[in-house]
Amino acid sequence: MPEKPLSCVLLADRHHGLTEGLRGLLQTAFGTVVMVADEASLLDGAGRLQPDVAVVDLSLARESSLGWLRAVRQRCPNLKVIVISVHDEQSVRRAAMEAGADAFVVKRAIATDLLPAVELVRGGRSGGASTDEAEVEIEN
């Protein structure tokens, strides 16, 4: 559980079932969770709401581009962005981190790894998480 509550977490994923489950997980610790389902809503929400953290599915955009991440970084340079994905290949992780992600969490381990990743990026810490490092990567 975080030391101080977040005012807002922005959750972006096209898959409604997953977002509902993640919202429940995040609300147990953080309170307000705003859900969006597309790139335009992510950019609008990030700019308008100024959330503390954004948890975003790597495949949010229909194409396999990380342009949304670069756009979020331009609009909200201090926003902590955690990318979630079904892909766990090192090349995918590296691409997300190089595009500006603060952390990367594999979806198959999201129930155990998301909250520790949020806490790590919130604290500005880098390096390995307390969970399996194969599942969570934090920007160094």
Where are these regions (language model features)?
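Conserved acidic segment of CheY-like receiver
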Residues: 5-17, 22-23, 35
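Short hydrophobic/Thr-rich beta-strand motif most characteristic of the beta2 strand and flanking loop
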Residues: 30-38, 45
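Conserved phosphotransfer microenvironments
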Residues: 55-70
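Short, conserved "switch-loop" micro-motifs in signal-transduction and mechanochemical regulators
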Residues: 87-88
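C-terminal output helix
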Residues: 91, 109-119, 130-131
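CheY-like receiver
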Residues: 118, 125-140
